Amino acid sequence: MLAGAGRPGLPQGRHLCWLLCAFTLKLCQAEAPVQEEKLSASTSNLPCWLVEEFVVAEECSPCSNFRAKTTPECGPTGYVEKITCSSSKRNEFKSCRSALMEQRLFWKFEGAVVCVALIFACLVIIRQRQLDRKALEKVRKQIESI
């Protein structure tokens, strides 16, 4: 018998569990980093940092409004670093993940985990109270029958 089946007002245990799992999965997918587009096989279209050594000229920083509109590398994360390729001496921009962004994502994840833990702790407490009431009712009926 399903948890809560046959009793009005109690949520179906499995349905609630699936709902929470789906919510958590959706939350994790929303926070997942965006994968870069698949690049073509020709090396002429590849950024120089994929095929040769490079040096970071400017550290990872947030894109300005203008740069976000004009530089496609700002799209995936909103942060970009300027690099200089060693052999070709080309200056290019590369999308990057900043420590601030990673910290923000970490705390969002931690908050979601704490919320899910609190929800399940409440469910455990509610179920324990139901079982205690059932046990007390059985004991009461046994005492009355004596």
UniProtKB/Swiss-Prot annotation:
GO CC list: centrosome; cytoplasm; membrane; midbody; mitochondrion; plasma membrane; spindle
Alphabetically ordered keywords of this record: Apoptosis, Cell cycle, Cell division, Cytoplasm, Cytoskeleton, Membrane, Mitochondrion, Mitosis, Signal, Transmembrane, Transmembrane helix
Keyword S-adenosyl-L-methionine in record: no
GO terms, molecular function: protein kinase binding
RNA-binding is among the record's keywords: no
Transmembrane segments: 106-126
Pfam family, one: JTB
Entry's localization field: Membrane; Mitochondrion; Cytoplasm; Cytoplasm, Cytoskeleton, Microtubule organizing center, Centrosome
Residues in coiled coil: none
Domain of life: Eukaryota
Any one GO biological process: apoptotic mitochondrial changes
Tissue expression from the record: Ubiquitous. Expressed in all normal human tissues studied but overexpressed or underexpressed in many of their malignant counterparts.
Predominant subcellular localization, coarse grouping: membrane
Signal sequence coordinates: 1-30
Topological category with respect to the lipid bilayer: Single-pass type I membrane protein
Membrane topology (Extracellular): 31-105
Up-regulation conditions: Protein levels increase during the S phase of the cell cycle, are highest during G2 and mitosis, and decrease to low levels at G1. Levels are lowest at the transition from G1 to S phase.
InterPro entries named among the record's database cross-references: JTB
Cytoplasmic topological domain: 127-146
Subunit: Interacts with AURKA, AURKB, BIRC5 and INCENP. May be a component of the CPC at least composed of BIRC5/survivin, CDCA8/borealin, INCENP and AURKB/Aurora-B.
Role this protein plays: Required for normal cytokinesis during mitosis. Plays a role in the regulation of cell proliferation. May be a component of the chromosomal passenger complex (CPC), a complex that acts as a key regulator of mitosis. The CPC complex has essential functions at the centromere in ensuring correct chromosome alignment and segregation and is required for chromatin-induced microtubule stabilization and spindle assembly. Increases AURKB activity. Inhibits apoptosis induced by TGFB1. Overexpression induces swelling of mitochondria and reduces mitochondrial membrane potential.
Family classification: Belongs to the JTB family.
Designated name of the protein: Protein JTB
